[in-house]
């Protein structure tokens, strides 16, 4: 069907949350974005985070989850990973705005005298900075194309002190961009009380009342519950919250996060928003997403991939890695299950054998610090000796190099990250990172971040996986392979340095040849950031394919 595209300004959709955190605002926003994209609209997304950190780059993974890195090198909230995966498009640093970043910019302007001696206040200066960040998302890209829709998610919960400047700012955006160009969606919890056997609407009513008290009237309410919310209850919420009945949608827990677009579409949320904003549209094209759901719900087999890490008590610390593994499964039309393995369990040969006995492949993900390192190395040794498919990421590559060096006779091989005075530092601090590591410069935002090119060796396994010898991946690291040991490691262990930076100075990929090990690959980069559920990353696809062969060989 031809797209009914008329000239119109960019529309802005703001997604807020009420009653409780962790309701799935990000997934709701991403799912709506996916639906609008599937209708032929150009959609971009943004996360407004009310914490005072400038970015999540220095935050504890146990507290915040993973740090998602964009192509342009921004360390951002993990929700940007959901946005990129659901929209299948790259976002930029502008997609994540924090209170810390806003205040830093405003204070810098004050120091430069840009406010001409005026008293700097939350209103208008902080709110103006937030508005500028939001409205900038509607500007044309380098190809001259402005987005049709900008979806901005406001972190936290309505009523939080930290969120107040952001809520005031988006209220003002409605005034400046025009009411016809703005839609507010409120995601709220409808709890089920088991003793009475009832869903309760009162928390949602109070949450919307709080939102209305600061001048924001939601156009739509997404009701989160562990079961379907009946129509009578939706009608009651529409009446009490002064929202159109068509704008109150039920979003019960779904079997998979990839089902959420279908759930919202079945409730006509995308239809309602299109009518509300007078957007050009076409019917939803379910071809790509439908094929994904077929793989999700009707797999032709399954494999188990172990993630050997030290932050496994909070799986969100490895969210993109887990999603990339699952996407590799979708690409092979199998279910890829993730087994969380504490690296400490693999420090001994017996411990590694026990922890990894029922997995078909292993991922050694990134991380920082020396805790759990010997366990990661133990898992690597087990995978190497038992021909278990393995993919190493960032720190995972460094651990593989250390393990190979020890195999080659460099028994004291280590990294300067773990031992500043290591006698055999096969992994060393990057020259430009030494000031940050020594404490002479800031830690935040100073790593080697973002997309960098790499050149792969002709005939290597990684070149076969990518189908190319020139590739680009996103990075987040301070340490690198010490080139002084490369030749000795290869001669003593057989490990091949199969990809480097274009000038050959920085190791980007290592592997064992296929005649030595069926799939033993590592990269200094973070390939998980570029994986999509509808388009798996070559390295993760290779891991799952190798895991299937390993599984078949065992049975």
UniProtKB/Swiss-Prot annotation:
Q: Which GO terms describe its biological process?
A: 'de novo' CTP biosynthetic process; pyrimidine nucleobase biosynthetic process
Q: Where is the signal peptide?
A: none
Q: Which GO terms describe its cellular component?
A: cytosol
Residue positions binding Mg(2+): 79, 153
Q: In which pathway does it act?
A: Pyrimidine metabolism; CTP biosynthesis via de novo pathway; CTP from UDP: step 2/2
Q: Where is this region: Amidoligase domain?
A: 1-279
Q: Where does CTP bind?
A: 21, 160-162, 200-205, 236
Which residue ranges does UniProt annotate as crossing the membrane? none
Q: Does the keyword Ligase apply?
A: yes
Give the activity regulation note.
Allosterically activated by GTP, when glutamine is the substrate; GTP has no effect on the reaction when ammonia is the substrate. The allosteric effector GTP functions by stabilizing the protein conformation that binds the tetrahedral intermediate(s) formed during glutamine hydrolysis. Inhibited by the product CTP, via allosteric rather than competitive inhibition.
Where does the chain bind L-glutamine? Answer: 367, 395-398, 417, 478
Q: Which residues form the active site?
A: 394, 526, 528
Instruction: List the InterPro entries hit by this protein, alphabetically.
Output: Class_I_gatase-like (IPR029062), CTP_synthase (IPR004468), CTP_synthase_N (IPR017456), GATASE (IPR017926), GATase1_CTP_Synthase (IPR033828), P-loop_NTPase (IPR027417)
EC assignment: the record states: 6.3.4.2
Residues at which ATP binds: 22-27, 79
Q: Which Gene3D superfamilies match?
A: 3.40.50.880, P-loop containing nucleotide triphosphate hydrolases (3.40.50.300)
Q: Where does UTP bind?
A: 21, 200-205, 236
In the record, the note on similarity to other proteins reads: Belongs to the CTP synthase family.
Q: How would you summarize the oligomeric state and partners of this protein?
A: Homotetramer.
**HAMAP family named in the record:** PyrG
Q: What else is known?
A: CTPSs have evolved a hybrid strategy for distinguishing between UTP and CTP. The overlapping regions of the product feedback inhibitory and substrate sites recognize a common feature in both compounds, the triphosphate moiety. To differentiate isosteric substrate and product pyrimidine rings, an additional pocket far from the expected kinase/ligase catalytic site, specifically recognizes the cytosine and ribose portions of the product inhibitor.
Question: What is the role of the protein in this entry?
Answer: Catalyzes the ATP-dependent amination of UTP to CTP with either L-glutamine or ammonia as the source of nitrogen. Regulates intracellular CTP levels through interactions with the four ribonucleotide triphosphates.
Q: What is this protein called?
A: CTP synthase
């Amino acid at each position: 069907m031809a797209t009914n595209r008329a000239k119109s300004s960019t529309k802005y959709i703001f997604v807020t949350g009420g009653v409780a955190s962790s309701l799935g605002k990000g997934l709701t926003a991403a799912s709506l974005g996916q639906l609008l994209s599937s209708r032929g609209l150009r959609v971009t997304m943004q996360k407004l985070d009310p914490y005072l950190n400038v970015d999540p780059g220095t935050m504890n993974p146990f507290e915040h989850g993973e740090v998602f890195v964009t192509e342009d090198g921004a360390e951002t909230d993990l929700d940007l990973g959901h946005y990129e995966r659901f929209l299948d498009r790259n976002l930029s640093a502008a997609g994540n705005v924090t209170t810390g970043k806003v205040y830093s910019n405003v204070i810098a302007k004050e120091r430069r005298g840009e406010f001409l001696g005026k008293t700097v206040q939350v209103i208008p200066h902080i709110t103006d900075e937030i508005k500028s960040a939001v409205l900038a998302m509607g500007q044309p890209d380098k190809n001259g194309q402005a987005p049709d829709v900008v979806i901005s998610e406001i972190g936290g919960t309505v009523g939080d002190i930290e969120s107040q400047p952001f809520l005031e700012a988006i209220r003002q955006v409605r005034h400046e961009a025009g009411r016809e160009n703005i839609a507010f969606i409120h995601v709220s919890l409808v709890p089920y009380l088991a003793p009475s056997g009832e869903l309760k609407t009162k928390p949602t009513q109070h949450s919307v009342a709080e939102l209305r008290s600061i001048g924001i009237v939601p156009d739509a309410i997404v009701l989160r519950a562990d079961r379907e919310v009946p129509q009578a209850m939706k009608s009651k919420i529409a009446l009490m919250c002064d929202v159109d009945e068509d704008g109150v949608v039920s979003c019960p827990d779904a079997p998979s996060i990839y089902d959420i677009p279908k759930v919202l579409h079945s409730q006509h949320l995308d239809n309602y928003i299109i009518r509300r904003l007078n957007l050009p549209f076409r019917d939803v094209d379910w071809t790509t997403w439908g094929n994904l759901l077929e793989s999700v719900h009707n797999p032709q087999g399954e494999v188990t991939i172990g993630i050997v890490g030290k932050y496994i008590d909070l799986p969100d610390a490895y969210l993109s890695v887990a999603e990339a593994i699952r996407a590799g499964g979708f690409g092979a039309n199998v279910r890829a299950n993730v087994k969380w393995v504490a690296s400490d369990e693999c420090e001994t040969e017996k411990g590694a054998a026990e922890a990894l006995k029922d997995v078909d492949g292993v991922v050694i993900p990134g991380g920082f610090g020396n805790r759990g390192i010997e366990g990661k190395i133990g898992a690597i040794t087990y995978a190497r000796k038992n021909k278990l498919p393995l993919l190493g990421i960032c720190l995972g590559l460094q651990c593989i190099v250390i393990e190979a060096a020890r195999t080659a006779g460099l028994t004291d091989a280590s990294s300067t990250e773990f031992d500043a005075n290591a006698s055999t530092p096969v992994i060393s601090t990057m020259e430009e990172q030494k000031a940050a590591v020594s404490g002479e410069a800031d830690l935040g935002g100073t790593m080697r971040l973002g997309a960098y090119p790499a050149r792969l060796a002709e005939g290597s396994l990684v070149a076969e996986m990518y189908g190319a010898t020139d590739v680009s991946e996103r990075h987040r690291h301070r340490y690198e392979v010490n080139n002084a040991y490369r030749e000795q490691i290869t001669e003593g262990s057989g490990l091949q340095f199969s990809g480097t930076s274009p000038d050959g100075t920085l190791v980007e990929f290592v592997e064992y040849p296929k005649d030595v090990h069926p799939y033993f690959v590592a990269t200094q980069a973070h390939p998980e950031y570029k994986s999509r559920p509808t388009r798996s990353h070559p390295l993760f696809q290779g891991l799952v394919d190798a895991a299937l062969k390993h599984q078949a060989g065992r049975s």
